[in-house]
Amino acid sequence: MSLEENLSRVVARHDELRALLSTSAGGGEGFVRMSRELADLAPVVEAIGRLDDAKAELAGARALLDDPDMRDLAREEVLRLEAEIPALEHGVKLLLLPRDEADDRGVILEVRAGTGGDEAALFAGDLLRMYERYAQERGWRFEVMEASDTDIGGIKEASAAISGRGVFARLKFESGVHRVQRVPVTEGGGRIHTSAATVAVLPEAEEVDVEIEEKDLRIDTYRSQGAGGQHVNTTDSAVRITHLPSGVVAQCQDEKSQHKNKAKAMRMLRTKLYDHARQTADDARAEARRVQVGSGDRSERIRTYNFPQGRVTDHRIGLTLHRLPEVLAGTALDEVIEPLIAEDQATRMAEIGG
């Protein structure tokens, strides 16, 4: 379907909804649903109107180019409108893109050390701190839900809840394998080692999103463990919850209170189940995303952080920045995220006639 056909379809649907609502008695689910759809279409139709007006003005200005008295003024108008119309078209295409209903949600961020032993765990800690600083930069709330530390200050695995406006929209392309190339602190010979850590970004679920029945849960309690596996609590305050039908597991041991650990574990479990259902229900969109920016599968390397060269390379879009310290500090992470969002938008716009 061409862009023009898409625009005509949107305007026709907008007019149809207005007519239906004007003759409706109001109330009921159908009325509410149509009202919401009309509200969603209103800014699109307004943008289409501005685009149509600009195209009409351009046609009028071009018609005056043959008039000796108006030629200079008409030429200026033609140049202005020819520069303005592509931007208006781009704005309309962005509004036509289907919204990911999860974009406005917070996320559960999971970071795990991959290949590379102690160095991989140290790098996993670097990534977790990078996202924490980035959250602070954007005014989001960052809360560690679960962390398994190593003796030398690294992280085997950790989960964090990030809350704020549009968190998932900005972080969803961070899922995948992140690779680091540097000389480990434990390396005496100065040799560069390659290690990896995995990142998963799950849109956080609300209670209304996922129905969890108590009979489907197995709840185990155990003693919290610190670095090296030693027990750090004399009571069974740590909680592990298994959703029996799916096999999904969530656990938490960060709080001293078993009640608080259970609440956090349930929050993570709900999010994991929501993400599973969301992906299952929309395989087509998941496949489109795999084509556009990579699947975020744990086996896929998405980004390399090269310390000797001070370089960050995102392999999905061929982007290289020589600003590694700033990226890891969270202050320049947007310089990686913005191009990924733009690439995703460009690919989806092409699908609607762009």
UniProtKB/Swiss-Prot annotation:
Residues annotated with N5-methylglutamine modification: 230
GO molecular function, one term: translation release factor activity, codon specific
GO cellular component annotations of the record: cytoplasm
InterPro entries to which the protein is assigned, alphabetical: PCRF (IPR005139), Pep_chain_release_fac_I (IPR000352), Pep_chain_release_fac_I_sf (IPR045853), Prokaryotic/Mito_RF (IPR050057), RF-1 (IPR004373)
Stored Gene3D superfamilies: 3.30.160.20, 3.30.70.1660, 6.10.140.1950
Sorted UniProt keywords: Cytoplasm, Methylation, Protein biosynthesis
Subcellular location: Cytoplasm
Protein name, entry field: Peptide chain release factor 1
Organism: Rhodospirillum rubrum (strain ATCC 11170 / ATH 1.1.1 / DSM 467 / LMG 4362 / NCIMB 8255 / S1)
